[in-house]
């Protein structure tokens, strides 16, 4: 009976040791499985980190490229703004110059018109400015005690001999020929300013008749 009891106790210990061994092997297998899964997950994480770093590098390159493009664009816009401002300033200066030029032209025109009026009244001469600069056409009124004498004239501006003869005649009638010549010159200037686009072919030959020498002998046409 004692032997049976001892064997039973031994079997129990053997069984307990076997069960414990099985449990340890099961735990070891579970740990190995968990370690493998962890290593697999760690490898996936490492690969994900590598891909992430690559994506970050690509993104950084794109950001740098966009930044450089933006800096170039900003620089271009600044240069363009400076050029626009410089153009505005040039236009302002040009407009002011044009304004001053127009003012001087108006002033000169008013001075000429006033001089023409004064000389016309002083010499009693009316100049047909529509005929200028090709022709010197008009009439001089010689005031007398009993009646006025009209001295009409119609000559080509290039007819130096005819103009010389006319000036000699006016001079003989005590008309201030220098004033008469100045009147014709100013009237010619006004006419050429009024029709600058279509000058006559011989306009360059229309010299001021102020150059006529009154001391030279009269040449009859």
Swiss-Prot record:
Component of the Ndc80 complex, which is composed of Ndc80, Nuf2 and Spc25. Belongs to the SPC25 family. Signal peptide: none annotated. Residues 63-114 form a coiled coil. Keywords: Cell cycle, Cell division, Centromere, Chromosome, Coiled coil, Kinetochore, Meiosis, Mitosis, Nucleus. The keyword Nucleus applies. One of its GO terms (cellular component) is nucleus. Acts as a component of the essential kinetochore-associated Ndc80 complex, which is required for chromosome segregation and spindle checkpoint activity during meiosis and mitosis. Required for kinetochore integrity and the organization of stable microtubule binding sites in the outer plate of the kinetochore. Participates in SAC signaling that responds specifically to disruptions in spindle microtubule dynamics. The NDC80 complex synergistically enhances the affinity of the SKA1 complex for microtubules and may allow the NDC80 complex to track depolymerizing microtubules. The keyword Ribosomal protein does not apply. It is found in: Nucleus; Chromosome, Centromere, Kinetochore. It comes from Drosophila eugracilis. One of its GO terms (biological process) is meiotic metaphase chromosome alignment. This is Kinetochore protein Spc25.
